Curated annotation (Swiss-Prot):
GO CC entries: membrane
Source superkingdom: Eukaryota
Pfam families: 7TM_GPCR_Sra
Keyword S-adenosyl-L-methionine attributed: no
MF term (GO), any: olfactory receptor activity
InterPro entries xref list: 7TM_GPCR_serpentine_rcpt_Sra, Nematode_rcpt-like_serp_alpha
Bilayer topology annotation: Multi-pass membrane protein
Sorted UniProt keywords: Membrane, Transmembrane, Transmembrane helix
Chain segments annotated as transmembrane: 30-50, 63-83, 120-140, 152-172, 199-219, 249-269, 289-309
Origin species: Caenorhabditis elegans
PANTHER family, A to Z: SERPENTINE RECEPTOR CLASS ALPHA-10 (PTHR31357), SERPENTINE RECEPTOR CLASS ALPHA-32 (PTHR31357:SF2)
Protein family according to the UniProt entry: Belongs to the nematode receptor-like protein sra family.
UniProt-recorded name of the protein: Serpentine receptor class alpha-32
Amino acid sequence: MEDYAENSFNVIPISMEYIRDLRTATSFRVYVIYIDLVLILALFLSIHAIRELTSKQLFSKSITHLLIASLVYGNVHNASYTIIETWSLYRSFAYSDNMTAIMFTSEECFVQHVLNSCVRFLFIAIELALNVDRIIVILFRKHFHCYPGVRGEILNILAVILSFALGCLLHLKGPHPGIVTTSCFRETDITINLCSTNLTSYTILSACCAALDFLMMWYTWNDRKKINYDLNSQYLKVEQHHSLMAVSLNSLLQLFVTSIYAISMFVLANMSMTNPELGNANLLRWFYTTPYSTLLVPIQIKVFIQWIGNRRKRRINTATRVSLTQDGYFTKLSDSWK
């Protein structure tokens, strides 16, 4: 977890001219309008994906429940982020000549800091819940159909508790007097301060989730090759393989897009030591990739639903052709004895 040392939040002297340029820059205003449009698009795609998940039973009830929760929490995060940035945009117009009012203080942003931190952790925690559900399915394959809906709800609740507990734990010291920021998204963003971004905890959670995804994919890929003469067990194994691979790929791609933000922050923090302009708030915004991740998730779900559905159709068509061939063979054999 982050080391909130006393010198982590030193007040950085910034000229009024620099603040005016930062807060009224066209790049900042264009970004807010652009990201709001991205988040609206993500909302519409998520609604469509949720309808697909509820109408087509291609995943178990627990996985379906957690995938829907992932879509919902992604859009909750987007709503929180949109409110924060749009509020900042409003101030950049309303107080363009008041350099004190145009900035945000740590005290007025504290609730938003905590909420946004919790929701970002929840975005990763729900992926961990999906991993736990897949582990349960693998370990108890013959009984995975027992209480799948309840299992999904329990894992969902645990993910919420974990993320909000971690988010609140990282803000136990409360607001930091004297600190100002361009929006309520980060506790300090005039220059990069990695001690105030929760990146360490965020990166650890993402890395653990990605490692579990790779493990699940490796196991299910090798497990499908094992011969099983129980037709029902073999069918369940194939169905679980398709759904688990789809969910793992979805989670990995989502985490990859999200991790770009963490990597960029570390890189820009080092580069800004020699060139401070590489650490200013307007540049940092463009590297926040979680909104793109929430845009990607419903698209991925739609693709995987189509993929699994097509594979099922091919399997059914193959089985039907074999059945007709066998019927024709025995009909001809019967006729030959007449």
